[in-house]
Amino acid sequence: MRKIFTPELSGKKGKHAMTPEIMWALKAKLRESGLKLSKRRIIWAVSTICWAGALRVHEILARHARSFDVTSTMTVDDVKVTDAKVDGKVTRSLKIHLKHPKEERLSAGVTIDVFETGDFMCPIDAFKKWRRDAKVTLDKPKPLFRLEGGENYTGQAFNRDLRKLLKEVVDYEKSPITAHSFRRGLATFMAKNNYSDAEIMRIGRWHSRAFELYIATPREVRAKLAEELAGKVAKYMELS
């Protein structure tokens, strides 16, 4: 079957960025997949949160199905839906606590915000639907993202699911889509829409200094940027 999309190179050989078009295709493939609703929900929630937060996959998912590192794995009480006021309007966000961010070895971790977007890739909407339809009890001491059988949803399992869903969309021999494609995807999209290197580095926390700037940037400013990005995604999809 002819592949529909050729994802864009991120600057590293063999590494490709997720695009809004492929996110749209992924959502369509999930609807057609025949997977149980709870499984579709978890795949889409992880996808949208990784894109919107420019997260590394093991900042959100466990490395092992039957065990986890309490010092680094995201657990149920690490994510909360909250409100933020932006230009006099209240917008929802996910407050995500990263226990062990790569950029800084902070014993207390750090909290980042992922804001609602109102488009088809809205991470708040995806998260709430997954939480509503999850078939496991969300116990605070346990990893947040777990499957129906109780095992942890791992980065490896996520990559495997992406490949099954997108194998007829992208050429995996030439342009594989992996969990890290979401993080690269946001940076690529921002660059195409004329955001400065400083803004891109700050939102993606690409090095220690950018990490410090992210923390120093007021929450309202980050919310406004998320709103602008959502508008650009919507316009981009209309023109595609």
Model-derived regions: residue spans:
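Extended, non-catalytic subsegments within catalytic or DNA/protein-binding/adaptor domains
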Residues: 1-240
